[in-house]
Amino acid sequence: METKQNDAPNDTHKAAAELVARMSIEEQALLLSGDGWWRTHGIARLGLPSIWVADGPHGLRKSPSSDEPGMTSVPATCFPTAPALAASWNTALLHEVGAALGREAQAADVQVLLGPGINIKRSPLGGRNFEYFSEDPLLSGRMAAAYINGVQSEGVGTSVKHFAVNSQESERMSTSSDIDARTLHEIYLPAFEIAVREGQPWTVMSAYNLVNGTPASEHTELLTDILRGAWGFEGMVVSDWGGINDRVRGVEAGNDLEMPGSGDHNRNKIIAAVREGRLSKDALAQAATGVTALVLKAAAAHRPGAHFDAQAHHALARRAAGEGIVLLQNADQLLPVPVGKKLAVIGAFAKTPRFQGAGSSLVNPIQVTNAYDELVALFGAGNVVHAEGCDGEGDTTASMLDDAASKAASADVAIVFAGLPESYESEGFDRRSIDMPPGQVQLIEAVAQAQPNLVVVLLNGSAVAMRWADKVKGIVEAWLGGQAGGGAIAEVLSGRVNPSGKLGETFPVSVEQTPTFPHFPGRDGHALYGEGVFVGYRYYDTRRLQPLFPFGFGLSYTRFAYTGIRSSSNRFDAEGGGSITVDVSVKNIGAVAGQEVVQLYVHERAPAVVRPEIELRAFDKLALEPGEEKTLRFTLSRRDFAYYDARSSAWSVHAGTFDLRVGGSSRDLPLQVTMEVQGRHGAKRLSRQSLVRDFKGLGGGDAHYAELVRALGMGDLLEPAKETPDMTAEQIAAQRKARMATFAFVDEMPVNKLPAFSLGRFAETRLEEMLRRAAS
């Protein structure tokens, strides 16, 4: 059964408002705080039930009781974690996983699933990176929207989190994310915007941190002006658990529900604030209406007696894990390993896999498969031996290393399972380095000396350094692949599944190479986002730095040729409200079927502002049989060419030449089409502090700009330079230099200085009149 998540939202809101109007102030305040850890309050006299919310992003984590924080939970399918799902670049798959999560929530009588987490992976050191999709906002947003639509198609709400600018665990409840407006709007908000516009989640969860000094849970600009005003969010805002600072200010800002419940503590504060006139009755009623509307929507979608097929969900988890596996290295085409070869399977993770992260997302899995057992099933017990090599924490001994090397030497292929132990990455703390445990590195190097045919399989939630990479032939990134990850790994290693995953984050050579290295995680209560918009590949590609593995990268057991590109036009009027299409043809020129993630990036040749070298603007995944060729179509609009102009608080497009580059990763873009884009600044918010150059292009022309230049007595700059035949080349060059310097002086002048610089010719009243005309 599919339930439309947005069926008659106005009717639901109207019914909720009518119900709230019948409530006392005390009852309204009661709704604004949870009943224990996981339930909302009900109001029996009005027939308003209580609903249940539960973690988490990759599997249901329902506590046996709402009075418990969730240290134990009912069994549920543990799907692959967010990085693995994002590496699939498959929105249809995310919808399937979301729908399965929705079915499990319905069966467990859970009305809202607390996910997905879509914070940007600003640094590989982020302790909670295993819960987040990507370093790129488009990939994060599209994965999230598909997941949301899947969950909510089953009549269960989602909670997109953590809003916003929440990319670290260190001092996570007290640190201020200090960020400029352009970076906020270009990097850290778009994933949430896409999720809201394309998925309309039932709830959004505010973050623990402060944003530029204001707690996210009481940030009016984020929760009301942007989320509800600019994006049209129709749902309810809930705090992160324990994330309330000043409850009254939170209600004023648009934070509807406090979780977990605080008893009468904050309820009494709200009631007192209303009675004393510090909080309006309308603000209280609005928040209570948000909670009530959520409850009514959930009650209408509830399916008593719902159940799910655990084996079908396990099979889906296996398929999802397989699509997210990324083949990073395959020297001499060592992979896939033909069945019949002798394998030495090494490492504790081979038998006791790390398949999910730690913290609030921890799922109690229905079952767990491991790669060793799955490889034995495929290759036969006589062809597979195991050596511990190192324990689950990555510690080793000389005897363990000797045993591993000996068994590797007697095999045809050695497979070392390594990665990050739970103690290295978890909710609650950030990583100190991107290095793997030293014992694991020792193990890889010892096995490499004994067996040249070595494959390393990584189980980790974010990027790791690989100083050993040139000593091994194969590297397989399997992430934290969920309860069925072991089977998926075996299928990829044996060739039963052709790997099609692509990295959703850059793997740097070292932590010192990362853009956040000087800033992360911050100090003295402040996290400085000093790298600006240059996050992930935007930084590496702009700086011409070679990472270990680039964003969007992933190998296959087949080969793909990018055979053609064509745009619907070589000119695009960005202000015309239309769009432009780009057709891309790709052919499978290998011997086996495979899937390719086709990625489109935009590059501006001569930007008026500093911009990243390239930015992802579209992607799709194609399945191709050997010899098969397909053409897909991308559609781009104004926003895809725009940058956020903080001075005008608007998305702006400058006229110029743009390249649309297409290929299989951010560093492999063989196809390109070039177009001229006609544009101008967006709707500007001009003030006395605006610069003269900010008046260019207003109303489609430069009349305002010309008026300002003439007011300074420099109207001759608006005319072509007079270059006569009798002038020498040196005189012409000197004149051009002088004009450029004068233009720069004029353009950079704040208009509030014009009355003085014009010696009074440009009066204050004239300036005010021009500002009024420019704003009209």
Question: Could you say what each language-model-derived stretch is?
Answer:
Residues 370, 691, 750:
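Residue-level signal for threonine
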